[in-house]
Amino acid sequence: MLLHISATAFVYNPNIMLIWWHYLILFAVAFGVTLAAVPVVRSVAIRYGVVDQPGARRVNKEPIPRMGGVAMYAGLLAAFAVEYILELAHVWPGPFSLAQGSGVNMLGVMIGITLIVIVGVIDDVQSLRPGVKFLGQIIAAIVIASSGVLMSGFKIPLGDGRVVLGWLSYPVTVIYLVAFANIINLIDGLDGLAAGITGIGACGLFILTVTLVRNDASLVAIVLIAVCI
């Protein structure tokens, strides 16, 4: 399958070439903005003392600035803004519009992501109580699930069957999103580890969604790869 994808990528086809331009442009925007934002966020974090001190969970011997996620969020937001503007200008057919047609509200998804970032920044600055942080994550996850990003079911690994979750899609999705956010937070004991693992996961998602011709999801994946590098 991967060989087939690689081969078709080099055969001229207007639609295929257009989506690869999508990938390159959004990757460049996300990467460039994140790269430019890192020193700014770093300076602000150092100035206000928002740093990780050496401790039992950390291998660093000196303080490391927090809030790296803000720079990544800036890259993500910039790439999505460029995509949205170019879709409105009819520069290219819009995979985000496609997502809207399939019941996914991208604006709602971005609001949910923004809420998660806000909770993370506040926690970095003043260390939120676990209950308050957990509540903020749940609210953000509910917003994302309500925007149409749902785990509708899953395939049984050792058979051809599929379990359809039905109304359970909402609570299962919320639990998954909150759990995922906290898992990433827990492994963030080494500088760059969380971003590296997220980037590797995004690479896998990109390959899968390109295979399934899910251009909306593959664009999100390529932007994630760019901000994690």
Residue locations for each model-derived region?
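Pyridoxal 5′-phosphate
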Residues: 4-7
